[in-house]
Amino acid sequence: QVVFDKIEECFDDQKKSNKKEFALLSMDIDFFKSINDTYGHPGGDEVLKAVANTLRDACGENIVGRVGGEEFIAIIESKKDKTLEEYCESIRKSVIDLSIPFQDNNINITISGGVIKSSEVKDQEEFVNIADERLYKAKEGGRNQFIYS
């Protein structure tokens, strides 16, 4: 809920003061069901923790949160002099670089995401819905990627 409250706050601020554009990333761990099926819920939990920590580190001062299951959302207000595409690519690579130790294995994963800029929409509901639609396009298009349109 904190993430959705922050989205509302960002839209309100943008309307009041012509605040700079921000973006929403809707992200999902690829093939998470297979991870749970292979390693059980304890293995899945380790993956979720590792991804949450990695996203938190990769997103820095930006807001990131888990919104259910294996889905995460990030609100990107600061990109540290990177383009949005470069920023998302660095997130994707940081997840790929994970090697999550579990029992006698190392679990490797990828992440897919849908991206939208606040300038593309008029309200927060449309903002979230379009990001989710783009996430599904990323999944259908082969996974391990971010989709921007």
Language model: regions and residue ranges:
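Conserved long alpha-helical elements within nucleotide-processing catalytic cores of c-di-GMP signaling
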Residues: 1-23, 30-57, 65-69, 73-74, ...
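Catalytic-core segments of nucleotide cyclases and related cyclic-nucleotide turnover enzymes
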Residues: 41, 85, 103, 116-149
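Core hydrophobic beta-sheet residues of small sensory/regulatory alpha/beta domains
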Residues: 24-26, 148
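Short glycine/proline-enriched coil/turn segments at helix->beta-strand junctions
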Residues: 58-63, 80, 120-123
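A short pre-motif secondary-structure segment
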Residues: 63-66, 107
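Residue-level recognition of strand-loop junctions within catalytic nucleotide-signaling folds
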Residues: 37, 75-79, 96, 118-119
